[in-house]
Amino acid sequence: MRGHKQWITALSWEPFHLNYQCRRFASSGKDGAIRVWDVILSQCVRVLTSHTRSVTSIRWGGAGLIYSASQDRTIKVWRASDGVMCRTLDGHAHWVNTLALSTDYAMRVEATSHYDRAKFDPSKPEENAKQALARYQAMCPDGEKLVSGSDDFTLFLWNPEKEKKSIARMTGHQQLINCVEFSPDGRIIASASFDKSIKLWDGRIGNVEYEDQED
């Protein structure tokens, strides 16, 4: 499967509850493009272009939106169904390196609890998709949140389905941020940095909860 003009930087599958056939995933490239692929057709079905520099990270959200971070210092929100760019999220002063969604764990095919695992039946994908949708909706009744980390040493917390304005600008790291993750319940954000520290933040409002740094 070829199409990008430079190397590929990230991949993200369409959530199971949106497509239980697991046909589509998105890729991002150094060429600034996001491509949506159909694995059954083995071809690119859509190209999303608007970034002016390399795309560094992508997430396919549970509401049918694709989020992309770029070295052009922006995050873009795309409607996966037709490729329309819905909005641009501005705020970072340098490259945006990493993204995470509060629903990343909830959108996995199989839930983490023993009860939900017992209900999971690989032979019933439509029923499994309904269960996955219920988990997703329970996880984010007010919409999923997105966190971004940057070369400018900051993180931003967003409500990307509805707002262009960030919920919070999170500061404290002394060097670039290279990884962010929400906890499985979405309550905590962990961020890792070149400053050799990990910081924990409130996943709802962005306040710092705990920080650990090498002595």
Task: Label each residue range with its predicted role.
Residues 7, 21-24, 33, 44, ...:
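WD40/WD-repeat beta-propeller blade-loop signature
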Residues 102-144:
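A surface-exposed beta-alpha-beta supersecondary segment
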Residues 2-8, 49-55, 82, 90-96, ...:
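WD40/WD-repeat beta-propeller blade N-cap
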Residues 5-7, 33-35, 52, 65, ...:
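A conserved positional marker within WD40/Gbeta-like beta-propeller blades
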Residues 149, 154, 158-215:
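C-terminal or late-domain output modules
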Residues 11, 34-38, 58, 75-80, ...:
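WD40-repeat beta-propellers
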